[in-house]
């Protein structure tokens, strides 16, 4: 059995410019690595829709990891075995490691009952509001809203509310990751 190199990379602030979301500065490196036959596997907080768009724009053809490790997508025509426990979706073998978004939303909604947390979900917002908050164009904002495994929220509270919400999530084993800073 031979060992082949693989490059795993984040997107935000790595291949994508933190302020403009452009990958143009990385294009020539991606092309050279791709020409050498080395797979580039993005591992990101981005959604399936966002990564599919990125892969297309950068001519990437290998697998990818979405929503902070919630799922692995491997093209069905890849020269590797189908990941155990995977299902077929849109030309990819998908191995899910996280819960579906709706199950998470149900837990988060129950958690918020009786509280006065000021928070708004990305999927509850208009796409134009997401674009304003994130700096994304409208089409990119829509792709960012197409979450399958995680729920991005705009936290609008201050003071003791954040530690209280964190403690409540910890009790039910829901992990939150702060992004966008």
What are these regions (language model features)?
Residues 3-20:
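Asp-based phosphoryl-transfer active-site loop
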Residues 24-121:
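Active-site phosphate-binding/coordination module
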Residues 17, 82, 173-175:
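A sequence-level detector of short linear motifs
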Residues 7, 72, 151-153:
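Well-ordered beta-strand positions enriched in small/hydrophobic/aromatic, beta-favoring residues
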Residues 19-20, 76, 163-164:
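Short, glycine/acidic-enriched capping/hinge loops at junctions between secondary-structure elements
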Residues 111-181:
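Conserved acidic, metal-coordinating active-site core of Asp-based
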